[in-house]
């Protein structure tokens, strides 16, 4: 718990010192700031490997931007010369609590925008509230495709691709690497993320592995922590492949409980969103596991000056390399910066109104440490992006898990085209012209 409090305090200090840092560049008032709520798990099972790295990344990136120390094109101080004033909130506590916390951020703390939410259940709950209040909300991580498939929003954006890319990409990777899958089993959390991930994987498998049979199909509750019964069922099933979208503390617990019982030797483990557990698990993660990171992140990230700035800076600051949640909150912050400065270029350098910010973000694109982000889907409110997959291999010299057999997929190869529901696109054969 000490680490969570330290992050909260340091972000609070960052916010308090915003006005005392380097002088602004640009026509915006010297006293003007851009106040942004940041919501991530700082406690609970989703914190250690997921929420806290996101909080640390927000701290690092906002600190660098407020000093004007970002690489081009992000080298203007803050957002268009305005210092960024963060207000960080713990996402732990459930959807009802997060709805009230979001209202508090807008109505009590008077934030200009909110960047947040890892849980798909939380995203589904808070998106209508932002729309009701007519306030900008930038969802940085949650994966359910339902956000923009079941509703239309003007003030809500998701600055990262949804779960369809994780599962379509995973199946494409498996086929490319000639992974045998006559039979497969699945274990996913029983809420929006796990249900939607499972549906996408099963549907994609039907396209590229049409004869594969589904065996054990398990849906433990989020935060279950104990998987003895489930591991027994998976070992007994003896499937060629065990697929899972488990994440955070649940995934760590599953690996620690299943590996000693030989599951990874009996079946090929394929984990759609798992790079974030590599640092805490270390050599407890077996070799040969196929993993995704929900993007081209961490040890699968591109070699660019922007990624070098982020990867090296984060690693130097915190003693560990950044993983998916850190990348996803960073691309959201940079996306908002891009939109704010785009709006200011149009309005003569003034702090943009909500409507100006919304217009600038809709359909925009920007470079991130993980590659190009394009707001192409959801009427310009839903991002698509590149993604990478690989296998685990322990590096005894570095005393860490490395990733080998890395394959990158372009965004259009693993995401549905505009106006098409993800599951319909998958069942229609995942047609596109961007796959090699």
Question: What do the PLM-derived regions correspond to, one by one?
Answer:
Residues 22-30:
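Sec/Tat signal peptide C-region and signal peptidase I cleavage site
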Residues 56, 96, 111-218, 266-292:
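Extracytoplasmic ligand/sensor domains, especially the bilobed periplasmic-binding protein
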Residues 37-61, 89-95, 118-119, 187-196, ...:
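Extracytoplasmic "Venus flytrap"
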Residues 258-331, 341-347, 402-434:
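Extracellular/periplasmic periplasmic-binding protein-like sensory domains
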Residues 88-112, 176, 226-238:
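Short, well-structured alpha-helical segments in soluble
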Residues 56-86, 206-212:
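Signal peptide-proximal N-terminal region
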Residues 2-15:
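Bacterial N-terminal signal peptides that target proteins for export
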Residues 364-436:
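Solvent-exposed, acidic/polar segments of extracytosolic/periplasmic ligand-binding ectodomains
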